Structure formats: structure tokens, C-alpha cells
């Protein structure tokens, strides 16, 4: 049986979609091929790498990519993680299921370094919890 494809999209493919890709690889096992991309490619955010490392998931070798139409059109599930991606995501064929799981953008966090770091940790955990729920329930 061929693996299902899940494709996470956000604006810059630097934080949220990268963390979602890392969590999905952890939780979805061999059943899914996991990809992430952005409307633009902003590069991997060092704090996203650090936040995931803190929970034992290494995303440092993931790349920041723009949306690949081949992956998009062959995906079983496309998940947008921010309103910008939901609005600007290219049209998908009818057989591709699309869902929106909105999360705050940790790259836009304000305040002290500690406050910004806490923001990254919170969003990381929210994405992780959502992926765990999806892995357990399929929803």
C-alpha cells in the first residue's frame, strides 16, 4: 500500500510548518509521507530548531521550501497553519482534502528574549498536541 501524503503549509516555511513536519514524522510513523512548504521560503528559524530539540526532535536537516505543485496535487491532506497560507494556497484538486489548523506565528513574538522563547515553546506544544490528536483519531 502506498503511503499517504500530508503537506503542511505556512507563510515562510520557517517555524510552524517546520515544527508540524517534525511532530508528524514523530507521530505518524511509516503510514504517511510528511512534507512542509511556504508561500515563500524564509529559511529554517533557529528557535524552531532549538524548540524541537528541547523535546527530542531534530529538524535541523529539514529545508525551507516553496510550495511544490506536484506534492500539493498528489497530497491526501493539505494542512494550512496560518491565515495567510489558507488565503494564498493555490487551488487543490477535488480529491485533496484541505484543513486549516491555525497557530500564532512565533517569529512575530514580541517582548523579552524569555517571552519570545516561551512563545516558541507554547506554539511548539500546541502543534505537537494537535498532531498527536490527529495521529490518534485521524481528525
Curated annotation (Swiss-Prot):
The record ties this protein, via SUPFAM superfamilies, to: Phosphotyrosine protein phosphatases I
Q: What Gene Ontology terms for biological process does this UniProt record contain?
A: response to arsenic-containing substance
Q: Name the Gene Ontology molecular function terms of this record.
A: arsenate reductase (thioredoxin) activity; protein tyrosine phosphatase activity
The UniProt entry, under InterPro entries, shows: Arsenate_reductase_ArsC, Ptyr_pPase, Ptyr_pPase_sf
The record's induction entry says:
Induced by arsenate, arsenite, and antimonite.
Top EC class for this record:
oxidoreductase
What EC number(s) are associated with this protein in UniProt? Answer: 1.20.4.4
> Where is it located?
Cytoplasm
Question: What does the record give as the reaction this protein catalyses?
Answer: arsenate + [thioredoxin]-dithiol + H(+) = arsenite + [thioredoxin]-disulfide + H2O
The knockout outcome noted for this protein's gene is:
Mutant is sensitive to arsenate but is still resistant to arsenite.
Q: What are the catalytic residues?
A: 10, 82, 89
| Domain of life of the organism encoding this protein | Bacteria
- Describe regulators of its activity: Activity is potassium and sulfate-independent.
Q: Name one GO cellular component term.
A: cytoplasm
What CDD domains does its record include? LMWP_ArsC
Q: Which family, according to UniProt? A: Belongs to the low molecular weight phosphotyrosine protein phosphatase family. Thioredoxin-coupled ArsC subfamily.
Q: What does this protein do?
A: Catalyzes the reduction of arsenate [As(V)] to arsenite [As(III)]. In vitro, can dephosphorylate para-nitrophenyl phosphate (pNPP).
Question: Can you state the subunit structure given in the record?
Answer: Monomer.
Q: What is this protein called?
A: Arsenate reductase
Amino acid at each position: 500500500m502506498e503511503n499517504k501524503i500530508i503537506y503542511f503549509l505556512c507563510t515562510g516555511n520557517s517555524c510552524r510548518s517546520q515544527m508540524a513536519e517534525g511532530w508528524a514524522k514523530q507521530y505518524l510513523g511509516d503510514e504517511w509521507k510528511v512534507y512542509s512548504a511556504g508561500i515563500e521560503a524564509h529559511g529554517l528559524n533557529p528557535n524552531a530548531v532549538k524548540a524541537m530539540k528541547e523535546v527530542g526532535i531534530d529538524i535541523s536537516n529539514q529545508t525551507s521550501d516553496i510550495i511544490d505543485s506536484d506534492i500539493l496535487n498528489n497530497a491526501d491532506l493539505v494542512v494550512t497553519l496560518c491565515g495567510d497560507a489558507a488565503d494564498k494556497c493555490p487551488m487543490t484538486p477535488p480529491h485533496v482534502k484541505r484543513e486549516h489548523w491555525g497557530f500564532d506565528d512565533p517569529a512575530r513574538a514580541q517582548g523579552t528574549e524569555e517571552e519570545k522563547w516561551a512563545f516558541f515553546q507554547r506554539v511548539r506544544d500546541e502543534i505537537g498536541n494537535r498532531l498527536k490528536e490527529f495521529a490518534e483519531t485521524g481528525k
